[in-house]
Each structure stands twice: as structure tokens, then as C-alpha cells.
Design a protein with these regions (language model features):
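ABC ATPase "signature
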Residues: 208-209
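Conserved ABC transporter NBD signature motif
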Residues: 58-72
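ABC-family P-loop ATPase nucleotide-binding domains
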Residues: 82-137
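The feature captures the beta-strand-to-loop junction immediately N-terminal to the Walker
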Residues: 33-38
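Helix-to-loop junction immediately C-terminal to a conserved catalytic motif
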Residues: 51
Length: 234
């Protein structure tokens, strides 16, 4: 197996607040990792460190054997938890931005994703609903030939139709053996594609491992485990 992501005692502090606390895990090529927890548990901080947007405080993290930096930004396709495109853009401008900025951008994949998501290349970003914006962001993310896809709450707060389209796209990539990290609180919708899970609380991993082994050991689904671990917090 090829290790795509490895962390050892990964820690991130903001002043006196510890957002990520001694996180240790590995993700192999072709695996899907679910990063689960309530708001403020450290999920987004973890993803931003992987994406090279935040620097670790201590510990180790490597992506394909490299520490996060300019080189790994070319390996990681990151979908943040909020829209990152300028309102004045058309979808075609967003495509051009990705094509110019990312050498691994695959325009044929983007055209197919646009058809799947039922989006028009001439639409303005400012005219898109939240669900349509998220579909576009997912289309751009998956149009890169990246080593690792990192998705922060890709189905949160969107309408059911958009959620289904986004889920189908994620599931298709999982079946294609793409390496994916997903944060979500909508566990039921997506847990079947998880190979591994890590449950975070106050930045610490309170449960981590193979998803099927967690189900078998606890005698319940990943969603039920989520509800049990975070009862009173969600």
C-alpha cells in the first residue's frame, strides 16, 4: 500500500487554545477517511493544515512523503466549507482560474461534471443558489487529477437535490479509488463509503480506525456511534 497521508502527534495551537491535539493517523491510497465531530472539534483546522493554509505547532505531517508546502499544494485538491469564488465571476471565469492555476486541471472532467451538476458555463456566481455554488465548487475540486481530495462539509446546508448530486459525485470518486478526506455531520448520508473514521472532540481523537471494525466492535452504525459519542453536543 502507498501511504498518502501520515500524521504523528500533530498539534495546532492558537495562542492558549489547542485546536488539534496530538493527532496520529495514516491514510492509504484509494481510502476514504471520514473526519467526524461537532462544531469546534478541530475538523476544519486539520483540513487546513493538510491544504497548507495553516502551519502546525508541533508533531509531524506528510503528504506523499512531503511536508505541507508549495509542492503538496499541487497534490491536494481542497474544498473549503464556504464559497471561495468571486461574485463577479462567471462559471467560465472560475474554470479559467483553475485551469491557469492548477496544472492537473482536467477540462474534459470539468465538462462532464458540469453536465452531471446541471450547470451552465455562462452563469454568474452571484446568480447561483447555495446548492448550485456548492455543486460548482465540487465540480472544480474533482476536475483536478490530485493525489488527495479534501472536502470540508461538502453537503452541509444545501437543498436535497443538490445534496444528492454532490453525494453521487463523491461516491463515484470513491468507487474510482480516489483518496478522499471528508468532514461532515450528516453521517448517515455518506458513511457507507468510509474506509476509515476519526472522531474528534476538542482537537483530540477519541475514536479512530477502520470503519467496518468500528461497526463490528460497537455493534452499531457509524452514525449511531457519532450520536452516542457526541450526545448533548449536537
Amino acid at each position: 500500500m502507498t501511504t498518502i497521508l501520515r500524521t504523528t502527534n500533530l498539534t495546532k495551537k492558537y495562542g492558549s487554545k489547542t485546536a488539534l491535539d496530538n493527532l496520529t493517523l495514516e491514510l492509504q491510497k484509494g481510502e476514504v477517511l471520514g473526519v467526524l465531530g461537532p462544531n469546534g472539534s478541530g475538523k476544519t483546522t486539520f483540513l487546513k493544515i493538510i491544504a497548507g493554509m495553516h502551519k502546525k505547532t508541533s508533531g509531524e505531517i506528510t503528504i506523499c512523503g512531503e511536508e505541507p508546502g508549495i509542492k503538496t499544494k499541487g497534490m491536494v485538491s481542497y474544498l473549503p466549507d464556504r464559497n471561495f469564488l468571486y461574485k463577479w465571476m462567471k462559471i467560465s471565469d472560475a474554470r479559467d482560474f483553475y485551469r491557469d492555476f492548477f496544472p492537473d486541471f482536467n477540462e474534459q472532467s470539468f465538462v462532464k461534471m458540469m453536465e452531471v451538476m446541471n450547470l451552465d458555463i455562462n452563469q454568474k456566481i452571484s446568480s447561483l443558489s447555495k446548492g448550485m455554488q456548492e455543486k460548482l465548487n465540487v465540480a472544480l475540486c474533482f476536475s483536478r487529477e490530485a493525489k488527495l481530495y479534501v472536502l470540508d462539509e461538502p453537503i452541509g446546508g444545501v437543498d436535497p437535490l443538490a445534496r444528492d448530486m454532490i453525494l453521487d459525485s463523491i461516491i463515484d470518486r470513491a468507487y474510482d479509488k480516489k483518496t478522499i478526506i471528508i468532514t461532515t455531520q450528516l453521517v448517515r448520508d455518506i458513511e457507507n463509503i468510509f474506509d476509515r473514521c476519526v472522531f474528534l472532540s476538542d482537537g483530540r481523537a477519541i475514536l479512530s480506525g477502520n470503519a467496518e471494525e468500528i461497526r463490528n466492535e460497537r455493534g452499531m452504525s457509524i452514525e449511531e456511534t457519532f450520536k452516542e459519542l457526541y450526545r448533548g453536543q449536537i
